[in-house]
């Protein structure tokens, strides 16, 4: 009812009193209706309007310059002011465009093969095409997939075919499109250097081998750590009364590292004061290691 002829709308903009005398002409037919109020040039019309300036000579010059109004268009029967909705077009199931003009019951009664022959596109076809594209990019072509799964699925065929079909059905990185991997949040990893990590240089400027460990197989166990260990053992042997940290039964020139769980034989001077009594027996006041703490 807003844009009907019976109840016309009011112009939202008010004409300036400093303008020339003007009239409001209805472009779609019918004369404008003058609203009585404070400004007589404030007009009210039913539809879109055009403001024409007139000369000061009079309304005759403006009427001569005004073009003839087109004849009014016939309106559809119904409520005044209501617009007719555009004709709706049915979309096909794939959403790619309007479907054929065949009636609904006819297309619903057709099978997928008949609809495909008629030129329609099914969403199943799109899914198959997308799956074949991904399989082709990852090295698994459609013939290989059909051979693996068989005509009746993974249950058909022998044990080897079922096993290969089960491995093929497992989600793995090989079945993911490489384009999807490159465009995902994880960028493709850079190839690692064949030389490995950059080796640090020692104080003398020579490259240190990463496999140099004391007692390891790298370069026969002769590295910086092995040299330090040999110097340590020589210094320990030179000191008088040093604690023998070698395992029991080991030779003097044995430089093998100590194994976990081996018993150490320490001299009497190197032992720490501890509990001398047997386990379960109370200690006497004069024994070593039973002195009260100074509090």
Swiss-Prot record:
Stretches with biased composition (Pro residues): 68-77
Q: Where is the composition biased (Basic and acidic residues)?
A: 245-257, 280-295
Q: According to the UniProt record, which cysteines are disulfide-bonded?
A: none
User: What Pfam families does the database record attribute to this sequence?
Assistant: DUF5555
| Disordered: region residues | 1-111, 183-295
User: Where does this protein have compositionally biased stretches of type Low complexity?
Assistant: 57-67
Composition-biased stretches (Basic residues): 1-13
Name of protein:
Uncharacterized protein DOCK8-AS1
Q: Record the organism.
A: Homo sapiens (Human)
Q: Which gene encodes it?
A: DOCK8-AS1
């Amino acid at each position: 009812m807003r844009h009907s002829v019976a109840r016309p709308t009011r112009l939202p903009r008010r004409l300036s009193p400093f303008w020339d005398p003007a009239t409001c002409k209805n472009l779609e037919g019918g004369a404008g209706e003058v609203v009585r109020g404070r400004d007589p040039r404030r007009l009210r019309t039913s539809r879109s309007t055009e403001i024409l300036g007139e000369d000061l000579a009079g309304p005759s010059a403006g009427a001569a310059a005004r073009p003839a109004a087109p004849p009014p268009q016939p309106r559809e029967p119904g409520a005044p002011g209501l617009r007719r909705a555009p004709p709706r077009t049915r979309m096909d199931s794939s959403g790619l465009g309007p479907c054929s003009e065949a009636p609904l019951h006819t297309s619903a009664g057709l099978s997928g093969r008949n609809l495909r022959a008629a030129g329609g596109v099914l969403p199943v076809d799109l899914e198959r095409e997308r799956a074949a594209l991904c399989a082709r990019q990852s090295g698994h072509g459609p013939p290989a997939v059909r051979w693996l799964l068989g005509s009746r699925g993974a249950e058909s065929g022998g044990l080897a075919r079922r096993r290969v079909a089960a491995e093929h059905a497992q989600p793995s990185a090989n079945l993911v499109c490489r384009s999807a991997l490159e465009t995902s949040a994880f960028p493709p990893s850079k190839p690692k250097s064949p030389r490995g990590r950059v080796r640090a240089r020692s104080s003398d400027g020579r490259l240190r081998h990463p496999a140099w460990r004391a007692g390891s197989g790298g370069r026969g166990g002769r590295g910086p750590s092995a040299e330090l260990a040999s110097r340590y053992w020589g210094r320990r042997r030179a000191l008088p009364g040093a604690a023998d940290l070698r395992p029991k039964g080991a030779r003097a020139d044995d430089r093998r590292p100590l194994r976990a769980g081996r018993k150490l034989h320490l001299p009497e001077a190197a032992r720490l004061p501890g509990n001398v009594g047997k386990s379960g027996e109370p200690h006497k006041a004069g024994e070593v290691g039973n002195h009260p703490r100074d509090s």
